[in-house]
Amino acid sequence: MQIEIRGLTKLYDQKRGLLPTSFGVKHGELVAIVGHNGAGKSTLLKMLANWILPDSGHAMIDGIDLRNRVAVVEKVGFVPEVPNLFDFFTVEYNLKLFALLFRIPSTRVNNVLREFNLLPFRKNKIQELSKGLKQRVNIGRALLTDPSVLLFDEPTSGLDFEMTKELYRLLKSIHDSGKIILFTSHRPEEIKNLATRIIVLHEGGLVFDGSPQQYFESEVHENLYAS
């Protein structure tokens, strides 16, 4: 299992969204996408998830073009920064709606409820849940299709310390199951705790790609947090 990104580009009204960007991700990697607001991090993930289309370039998973929406649903799970759940529906109904839309067996919904310790909350409406539980539902929904690749946009945004630690454990468990994970982050401690590799975007361009040790010893890291 591997991702190949070649010349992926997105411009917004002639402004930088993502300049031509190329890199690959191999099975077993947990990649942090780092950079300031507006660097292109979310744009990159949304293109990989087929939420937005690139102006040019392409991305592939095991030779399958991610512009193919059916392939994306099967191969890629996307967890946006703000959970896009139906607040007035229950946890279980949110998952069942997604499963129905993509013809996922109902047994998979029950498995996700169990795996993510959501059974006690299955009849709760989303609006009744804490931020941490909402994020757990958000992640569970992304895993309903059993994707090979998971994309997380600022996964701990708005979570308190205990919720953040719980989410770290959950992400590590998902990674240990053999999935590729890419996540965006502003937090140095999050990158240290999770990433096996770090990619830095600046003003839409890729300026660093290396190990956590290389990153934290680099001028790129110093400049990123000095500015």
Predicted regions and their residues:
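The feature captures the beta-strand-to-loop junction immediately N-terminal to the Walker
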Residues: V34-H36
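Helix-to-loop junction immediately C-terminal to a conserved catalytic motif
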Residues: A49
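Conserved ABC transporter NBD signature motif
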Residues: G57-R67, V72
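Helix N-cap at the start of a conserved alpha-helix in ABC-type nucleotide-binding domains
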Residues: F161-M163
